[in-house]
Regions:
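Bacterial N-terminal signal peptides
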Residues: 9-19
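Structural motif
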Residues: 75-77, 119-120, 128-130, 151-152, ...
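Positively charged n-region of N-terminal signal peptides that target proteins for export
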Residues: 1-7
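Short glycine-rich loop/turn motifs
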Residues: 35-38, 117-118, 170-175
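Active-site-adjacent helix-turn-beta-strand microarchitecture at beta-sheet edges
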Residues: 85, 89-165
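Short, solvent-exposed aromatic-acidic interface loops
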Residues: 54-58, 135-139, 188-193
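Domain-core and long-helix interface of multi-subunit machines
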Residues: 144, 148, 155-194
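Zymogen propeptides
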Residues: 21-112
């Protein structure tokens, strides 16, 4: 019997969001001006991260990952996750099934990953967490799955002050968030520009 996974994330060499989402109760869209966003509500126990296959090779595409997983899982949604280098190595922390594949990155530098504070999304014992990198570093959390990315958009209910109205980056983006009720939501730009 196949296990159902309603949300999978993967690290790929393409920044574009490549996914096909069926009409699910957990998925909805909303429009804000000229932009359409998708929101997917997931249960933490249904979320997994996948970077490399059994031979240690990067999946390279969402289709390849989906094909690899479908014999064992009913895949409901896949999206890219994290920030990575040109050689397909994640820029920061990456943990799959409790095994650390890449260490936490606390270095300063240029680019989106280093806009501070950046953060860590983690699932430990089926509970989701979103922490700043420094808070994660101080925590005793032992996640089953975790990835470090950046920058954090909202911190404790307030927009990250590093973002200014004059910043212009109209690339399609995706994000993970927790509601006040600790519901896990994944958001993505579907179409449009401001």
């Amino acid at each position: 019997m196949k296990k159902t996974i309603k949300f999978l994330t993967a690290l790929f060499s393409s920044a574009s969001l490549l996914m096909s989402v069926p009409a699910l109760a957990e998925y909805r869209t909303f429009d804000d001006g000229n932009i359409t966003y998708g929101i997917f509500q997931a249960k933490p126990e249904e979320v997994q991260l996948h970077w490399k296959d059994a031979e240690g090779k990067d999946y390279q595409s969402l289709t390849r990952l989906k094909n690899a997983l479908e014999p064992s899982y009913n895949v409901k949604m896949i999206m890219n996750a994290g920030i990575y280098s040109m050689n397909n190595t994640t820029a920061g922390l990456w943990i799959e099934h409790g095994k650390e594949l890449n260490a936490l990155n606390t270095k300063s530098g240029k680019g989106n990953f280093h806009v501070q504070p950046n953060g860590v999304f983690a699932i430990a014992k089926n509970k989701p967490y979103i922490l700043t990198t420094s808070a994660y570093q101080k925590s005793k959390l032992k996640p089953d799955f975790a990835l470090q990315s950046g920058p954090m958009l909202i911190i404790h209910g307030k927009i990250n002050p590093q973002f200014r109205a004059s910043l212009e980056s109209y690339h399609k983006r995706n994000a993970v968030c927790l509601t006040k009720q600790n519901e896990l939501l994944f958001l993505m730009t579907i179409k449009g520009e401001p």
